[in-house]
Amino acid sequence: MQTSLLKPKIIAVESLGENHAKVVMEPFERGYGHTLGNALRRVLLSSMVGYAPTEVTIAGVVHEYSTLDGVQEDVVNLLLNLKGVVFKLHNRDEVTVTLRKEGEGVVTAGDIELAHDCEVINPNHVIAHLSKGGKLDVQIKVEKGRGYVPGNVRRYGDETAKIIGRIVLDASFSPVRRVSYTVESARVEQRTDLDKLVMNIETSGVITPEEAIRQSARILVDQLSVFAALEGTETAAEAPSRAPQIDPILLRPVDDLELTVRSANCLKAENIYYIGDLIQRTENELLKTPNLGRKSLNEIKEVLASRGLTLGMKLENWPPAGLDK
């Protein structure tokens, strides 16, 4: 009787468009498609290294609720548009770039003055619209990071972070935009009870879908290698206690789930502001929320499931220190 496990012999990559691909891997033993597919998906969404604007200083602006003469967008929308610019740094971890433009017209990411080791992936991305006499002068700090880091939980080591007019942004570093997977049936000779893993990956263009799945696989191998070696420098008794790491996805506001206005308002009325708050609630608790019915509950469950989450989960040390409500 064969006791060794099958390893995938076929890995095919099919391009579905720019920065979008389908990766097919087969065969797997039954059950391994879901085991590996879910693990890869979680790593792809939460652990990929990327680049994002983290701080912005706009001439003539003290805080994000200001407006600028001659600029169609208010500062809040201007910041949202700046967060949509996809940067890529080469051989450095941070850089400050400048955006200066005046006169009537459209301001795009291609108007940003870049250093030689900084690149904009989407130069046609619209940032603002200037009317006659309008002027925009912006300093943008771009940093390398991982996952999603809300501005209100970031830590700084010097007083310069408190400069009036400097606006700290929520930073979504992940270069992976969307990931989904399905498990289909596969066959090898007479065996028909095998799995075929099909992953659908879309990135921002900083890395290709193929490179994204390679990096996620390396991360998993690196993490699991500790268990394979069963060697450590600390015993359980000697190891200092460490606070559990919180998945960056849980620090995102519930607005990022893109729920209907009705569902989102019901959650906020119950002081559910972050995804980490939401997943700790049970179905029965949510159904007791005024104006939140079964239809809204099903919508919430479907959106959470698309991110590998469910209701009724337990979190340690929640909320983390510094998380605003």
UniProtKB/Swiss-Prot annotation:
Q: Does the keyword Transferase apply?
A: yes
Question: What cellular component GO annotations does this protein have?
Answer: cytoplasm; DNA-directed RNA polymerase complex
Q: Which residues form a coiled coil?
A: none
- Report the EC code(s) recorded for this entry: 2.7.7.6
Which reaction is recorded as catalysed by this protein? RNA(n) + a ribonucleoside 5'-triphosphate = RNA(n+1) + diphosphate
- What SUPFAM superfamilies does the record point to? C-terminal domain of RNA polymerase alpha subunit, Insert subdomain of RNA polymerase alpha subunit, RBP11-like subunits of RNA polymerase
Q: Superkingdom of this entry's organism?
A: Bacteria
Q: Where is this region: Alpha C-terminal domain (alpha-CTD)?
A: 246-325
UniProt enzyme class: transferase
Q: Name one GO molecular function term.
A: protein dimerization activity
One GO-annotated biological process of the protein: DNA-templated transcription
Q: Which UniProt keywords apply?
A: DNA-directed RNA polymerase, Nucleotidyltransferase, Transcription, Transferase
Work out whether the entry's keyword set contains Cell wall biogenesis/degradation: no
Q: Where is this region: Alpha N-terminal domain (alpha-NTD)?
A: 1-231
Under the heading Gene3D superfamilies, the entry gives: 5' to 3' exonuclease, C-terminal subdomain, DNA-directed RNA polymerase, insert domain, RNA polymerase, RBP11-like subunit
Job description of the protein: DNA-dependent RNA polymerase catalyzes the transcription of DNA into RNA using the four ribonucleoside triphosphates as substrates.
Entry's free-text remark on domains? The N-terminal domain is essential for RNAP assembly and basal transcription, whereas the C-terminal domain is involved in interaction with transcriptional regulators and with upstream promoter elements.
Which family does the UniProt entry place this protein in? Belongs to the RNA polymerase alpha chain family.
Give the record's subunit note: Homodimer. The RNAP catalytic core consists of 2 alpha, 1 beta, 1 beta' and 1 omega subunit. When a sigma factor is associated with the core the holoenzyme is formed, which can initiate transcription.
What is this protein called in UniProt? DNA-directed RNA polymerase subunit alpha
Source organism per UniProt? Burkholderia mallei (strain ATCC 23344)
Tell me the lineage of the source organism.
Answer: Bacteria, Pseudomonadati, Pseudomonadota, Betaproteobacteria, Burkholderiales
**What gene does the UniProt entry assign to this protein?**
rpoA
